[in-house]
Amino acid sequence: MEQLQAVIENAFERRAEITPRNVEANLKESVAQVINMLDTGKLRVAEKINGEWVVHQWIKKAVLLSFRMEDNSFIKGGFSNYFDKIPSKFADYSSRDFRDGGFRVVPPAAVRKGSFIASNVVLMPSYVNIGAYVDEGTMVDTWATVGSCAQIGKNVHLSGGVGIGGVLEPVQASPTIIEDNCFIGARSEIVEGVVVGENSVISMGVYIGQSTKIYNRETGEITYGRIPPGSVVVSGNLPAENGRYSLYCAVIVKQVDAKTRSKTGINELLRGI
């Protein structure tokens, strides 16, 4: 693995020079190996080690290099045709492959090769980009998008129209992470490497990036970039010091433990705010 990483790191330093016509065979093979391991879940861009998320930047660099190495090509689809650098994850799938994968894909969901879909995942008509990791039992609802290299935990519900930001455009240092057992309400956007802690509930229409103020109603504390585990979050506003205007923020209205979260419906948690 160290040798593979070295090839990727060295090539990334001269990425501006790389084209589909001059890419070395060794580099092309190395990047393809990384993409295939991402596709099968043997590698992931970020993983939790000793309770902390660790980002493997070299894997993200391999994903970025794949765009430099490939020309657009014709991609045949069931309802249309496409022209892109990255093939569909399911381009060569048979019915047995789908059964072995243990997930369900509703047309016209689009999933790029190099993303991992675990068992018992349901993909409604949605989009999952390269490098993403979608763990067991998660629902990606209609028109939801899972951005490049985003990490989605177990038993997560991404409601209709949810946007989970990627790392490729614009380039971000860390992927957006939604931990286990989270509910993300319809049309919410979580981007720019924000981490949503496990067992959290994000209400409908909440937008959180790295510059979004996250206000804890109980403590009065303002933080950025991370939602603590067990948080119930709604959209809100904070007044300016001069009182002449207010700016958008995300408000943590309560925090619940995993036991309460498992016994309480989403509507109940949001209704009593």
Swiss-Prot record:
GO terms for cellular component: cytoplasm. Its main location: cytoplasm. It is found in: Cytoplasm. Signal peptide: none annotated. Pfam families: Hexapep_2 (PF14602), THDPS_N_2 (PF14805). Transmembrane segments: none annotated. Homotrimer. This is 2,3,4,5-tetrahydropyridine-2,6-dicarboxylate N-succinyltransferase. It comes from Nitrosomonas europaea (strain ATCC 19718 / CIP 103999 / KCTC 2705 / NBRC 14298). The gene is dapD.
